[in-house]
C-alpha cells in the first residue's frame, strides 16, 4: 500500500499521530491508511501469547478507529487527505505496522513516552517500529513535551 500508514489505539497519543498523518497525507496528496491492531495478549513475563482472532472484537476495534477518524476529520482545519481507509487486524502491533508499511511512503506513530522498567519489560511500539520499518517513520511527541 503506498501512501501513509498511521497506527491508532484510541489514546490521546494516537489521536495526535492521526492528526499529523492527515496533514501529511493532504500535503503530499497520498492516501492515508489508518491501522488499528486488536492486540494479542502479552504474558506475565513479557512473552507474547497469540489467541485466535475474534472477528467481533476486531470489528469493534475498526469501528472505534473509524469514530476517531471521523472526529479528527470534523475538527481538521485546512486541506484533507484524498482518501482515508480504516483497517483493523488481529496480531502484534509492531509486526502489523511493519507489514503495513512495507510498501508505504511513511509510517506515523504517537509516542507514549514510556521509559525505564516499562520499556525494558514490554518494549515500545514507537521505539521498535523505526528500527525495523522499510520506510521513514515519524514519531509524534506528547503534547505536553517541551
Language-model features: where?
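Glycine-rich, Arg-bearing micro-motifs that act as flexible, cationic patches
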Residues: 106-131, 146
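Short, hinge-like loop/turn segments at secondary-structure boundaries
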Residues: 49-53, 104-105
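General small-molecule cofactor/ligand-binding pocket signal
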Residues: 35, 85-89, 138
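Hydrophobic structural packing positions in well-ordered secondary structure
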Residues: 4, 21, 32, 97, ...
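Small/aliphatic-rich secondary-structure junction motif
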Residues: 2-51, 84
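Structural beta-alpha unit
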Residues: 13, 74-107, 144-146
Amino acid at each position: 500500500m503506498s501512501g501513509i500508514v498511521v497506527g491508532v489505539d484510541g489514546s490521546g497519543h494516537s489521536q495526535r499521530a492521526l492528526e499529523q498523518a492527515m496533514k501529511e497525507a493532504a500535503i503530499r496528496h497520498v492516501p492515508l491508511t489508518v491501522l488499528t491492531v486488536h492486540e494479542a495478549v502479552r504474558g506475565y513475563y513479557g512473552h507474547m501469547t497469540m489467541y485466535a482472532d475474534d472477528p467481533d472484537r476486531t470489528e469493534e476495534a475498526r469501528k472505534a478507529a473509524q469514530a476517531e477518524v471521523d472526529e479528527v476529520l470534523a475538527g481538521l482545519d485546512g486541506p484533507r487527505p484524498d482518501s482515508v481507509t480504516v483497517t483493523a487486524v488481529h496480531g502484534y502491533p509492531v509486526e502489523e505496522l511493519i507489514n503495513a508499511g512495507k510498501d508505504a511512503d511513511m509510517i506515523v506513530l504517537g509516542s507514549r513516552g514510556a521509559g525505564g522498567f516499562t520499556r525494558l519489560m514490554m518494549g515500545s511500539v514507537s521505539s521498535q517500529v523505526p528500527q525495523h520499518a522499510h520506510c521513514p517513520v515519524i514519531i509524534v511527541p506528547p503534547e505536553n513535551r517541551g
